[in-house]
Amino acid sequence: MGTNGVHVSFGAGHEMGGVMGNGSGQPPATEYTLQGVMRFLQTEWHRHERDRNAWEIEKQEMRARIANLEGQARRADATQKALKRYVSILEKKVKEQSAALKSGGKEKGVEDEAEAEDNKTKLDRSALIQEKLRPNTKLSGAPNEAENVEIGPPDDESARNELKTFLDQCQAEFTYLMVTPANPQPPRESPPLPILDDFREGEALNQQLEQSYQRSQQSQIRDLLAQQAAAANATNVAAVQSQQQQPQQQQHAVGPRPQTNQPPKGYGELAQGAPMERSSRGQQLHDILKSGETPDWSASMQSQPVEEPTSALSKAPPMVRGDGREPAVPKSASTTDAWDFNESNFQDPNAMPQPTPQQSFSSRPDTDAFPSAENLTKSPNRGALSHRRKSSSGMARRRSAEHELSLGSLQQKAEGTMFKFRFGLRGHLDVVRTVIFSGGGSPGEPEICTAGDDGLVKRFHIPDRHIGQRNADGDLDVAADFTHRGHSGAVLSLASWSPSPNFSTGGRAQGDGWIFSGGQDATIRVWERGRVDPKATLDGHTDAVWALCVLPTNLGAIFGQTNSHGPPDRILLVSGAADGTVKVWAVSAPPQLTSPQPGPGRRGPGGRVRGNSMSSGSAFPSSPQPTTASNSPFHHTLVHTIKRANSEASPTCITALSPNGETFAVSYADAAIIVYDTRSGEEIGTMASLDTYDGTNNTAVNAVVATTVGLDQTQGPGGEDESGGGPTGGGRSMAGSGVEGTIISGHEDRYIRFFDANSGQCTYNMLAHPGSVSSLSLSPDGRELVSAGHDMSLRFWSLETRSCTQEMTCHRSMRGEGVCAVVWSQDGRWVVSSGGDGMVKVYAR
C-alpha cells in the first residue's frame, strides 16, 4: 500500500485500485469486500453464540447451586423442628418423673400393706398343709395316741427324706432330658442332605424303642417304690402310701412320659433345636443304644439295674422323639454351619412327592457341593449348607465373570459397528437443507458440499484425524474451505457429478466435477471449484426447485452416439420443482483435468500416494483458496419436461432406479411414487403409495431411495450377484423382467415403506420415527439404511432383518425442523447429517 501511496502523491490523476490518496500522507482507507464482511459477521456471530452458551451454562450452575442451598436450608429447618419436638418430649418426661417422686411416699405405705396381706396368706396356706398332714398320723390304728404322737415325728421325717431323695432323682432325670448340656460333644463332619423317607421308614421302630423305654422306666419306678415301702416302718405304711401317691401326681404334672407316648414339652424344644442327620438305619440305632438291633431289647433292658439307663443315657446322644424323628450329633466341623430343621419348617410328608428311598449318598465335596435337585428338601434355614452356598456362589461368580467377558467382547464388537460423532462442520447461519459428497478430495479426506436457507453453498473436507483428536482450536469443529454465492433465496437441493476415481492417481478423480444446486429462486446453478459465482444457470422452472438427481449414465448411453441433444459425453440431470414439473437436462461434462499432485517427498516408499497425503483432501490448500476455475464453455439442453396430467403436486425427491440410468423414480407431495423412462420420459410404473394418502400433506412422501440389491430376508450373503455399482448400490435382478429393484420411501406420517418396483405393491411398512421422516440414504452394499427424522434423531436399519440397529439424537429442533438431510458415503465410512440448527455433523464407525 505504501507503493500505491507514492504513486498517488507524485502522479496526479493516477489512482491505484480502490486507494483514496490525497497527498497529505494520511494512511489509506481500509478496503472492504463482501467476503470479508461476511466472514467478520460469521466470526462475531460464533463468538456471540459461544458467550451465550457459556452464560447459559453458568446460569444452570447457579440455579443448581441455589437449589442445593435451598434444600440445605429446608433440611436445617426440619432438623431444628425435630430437635424442638424432642426437647419438649424430654421436658414432659422430667415433669412426670418429678410428680411420681412426690407421690412415692404415699404409694410406699400401700405396698407395705399389700406385702403384709401376702405374708398372711402364705401363713394360712402353710397352716392348712399342716392340718392336712396331722390326721394321717391318727389313721395308724395304734391303741395309744400318746405313743403315736411321740413316735410319729421321726417316722414322718424319715419318710420325707426318702421321698425327697426320690424326687431329686426324678428331677435330675428330667433335667438331663430337657436341658441342653453346656459342653455338647463336638460335631465330626458335615451332615448330608436329609431325606424325609428315612424318618418315615424308621418311625415304627422308633416308636417301639420309645414304648420299650417307657415300660422299663415304669418298672424301675415300681421296683424302687416297693423297696422303699418294705423298708419303711409298719406303723407308717399308710402315710407312706398316701405320700407316694402325691409325688406321682407331681410327676405326672411335670412330665407324663411314663403314661403317654408324647414327649415332654422341654424335650420337644430340645429336639427341635438339635441338628438333624440322615444316616443308615443301623447307624441310627447305634447312636441311640449299642444293642439297637436286638429284637428283645426291652426284656434285656428290664433286667438291668436302676442306674444303668442313666449311665447309658449319659453316654448316648439325645433320645428319640415321640414322633419318630431322631436328633443326632451333627457331623459338621462348625456349629454355625449346622442344620436348623424346625418342625414348623417341615411340610406334611403325605403332601410331598415320594423320592426314591434307595439312593446312595456320598460325602465327597464334589458331589455334596452340587446336590441333585431331586434330593433337595423344601425346608429353609440350611445352616449346614453354608459351605455349599459359598462354593456355589464362587462358581456363580466365575460363571458371571465368564459371562461378563463374553458380554464385553460382544459389546466391543457391537461398539465397532456403531456410528459415533466425529466432527461438526460450522459456517451456515440458518437451516442446512441438503448435504452431499461432491466426489472431490481424497479417499482419506473426502469433500462435502452443504447448502441451506442462508443461500450459501459451502465446501468442507473431512479431516483425516484420529478419533477424538482435536484441531488447533481445541474443538472438533471444521471450518468451510470455500463458499459459493449466487442464489437469491434459500438453496433447497444439491447434486454432484465427478469423474470416476483412478487407482493411478491415488484414488482421486481426474479433475473436479460440477456441483448443481436448486434454489427458491426457481433456478439451477452450476458451481465449480475456486469460483465464487456460478459457472452457469439453468432456467426453465417457474417455482422453487426441490429435487435434483444426476443419473449414473451419459447422453450417448441412453440416446445413442448421434442424437439431437448434444455430444454423447454430456451428463443427464433430472430436476423437480414446485411448479409440478420434472425436467431432464443434458449438460456439458467438466474438463478432464488432472488435479495437482503432491511432490515426490509426500509419496510412500512404493511411490503410491497415501490417502491422507493432502491436508485438505485435494491438491488445493484450504487457506487461501486459489482460483482454479476453467475457461471451458458450458452448454446445456432441455431433453424432457414431464408433467402429470391430473395433479399439480410438487416433486419432493428423485432417485435413479436402475444402475445404468435407464429409469428413475420421483416422489410427490401427494404421496405418489412414479417410475419414468429416461429415454422417452413416459411413466412406466406407479407404486401403491396413494393408498395411504389422506388428501393433506400429512401423508406426503419426503424421501425416496431405490436399490436393486435383493432384500429377501431368506437370501444369504453369498446368494447375491454383486455388480458394479452406481449410486443405488448395484446388484441382482429381482423381478426378472420389467422394472427391477425395490423402492424405499420415507413419509410425513412417520412410516418407511418398501415397494416392489415391478408390481408396485407395498411389501413392508414400519413405523420408523416419532416424527416425520425427512431423508433416507442407503449404504453402498445396499444392506443398511439410515433415516433422518424431524424428531432430531438418526436411525440405522438392517434391511435383512428390518430392525433398527442404532439410534442417536444428533441435532436440535429449530422451528419444528430436526434432521433435514442425511447421506452415506460411497465407501461406507462416513455418514453426514444436516439439521435445522444450522449444524452439519459427521459420524464414523
UniProtKB/Swiss-Prot annotation:
> What residue spans carry the Basic and acidic residues bias annotation?
104-125
Bias kind Polar residues: ranges? 332-348
Each WD repeat, start to end: 427-470, 486-537, 540-595, 647-686, 726-765, 768-807, 814-845
Q: Which GO terms describe its cellular component?
A: membrane
UniProt entry tagged with the keyword Membrane:
yes
GO MF annotation: an example: calmodulin binding
> Where do Basic residues bias regions lie?
385-398
What does the similarity note say? Belongs to the WD repeat striatin family.
| Compositional bias annotation for Low complexity | 238-254, 610-626
Location comes to: Membrane
CDD domains according to UniProt: WD40 (cd00200)
Report membrane topology. Answer: Peripheral membrane protein
* Region annotation Disordered: where it falls in the sequence: 97-159, 238-406, 589-632, 710-737
Q: Where is the composition biased (Gly residues)?
A: 724-733
Instruction: Kindly provide the name given to this protein in its UniProt entry.
Output: Striatin Pro11
Q: What function does the entry list?
A: Binds calmodulin in a calcium dependent manner. May function as scaffolding or signaling protein. Required for the formation of mature fruiting bodies during early sexual development.
Residues forming coiled coils: 46-85
Note the InterPro entries from the entry. Answer: G-protein_beta_WD-40_rep, Striatin_N, WD40/YVTN_repeat-like_dom_sf, WD40_repeat_dom_sf, WD40_rpt, WD_repeat_striatin
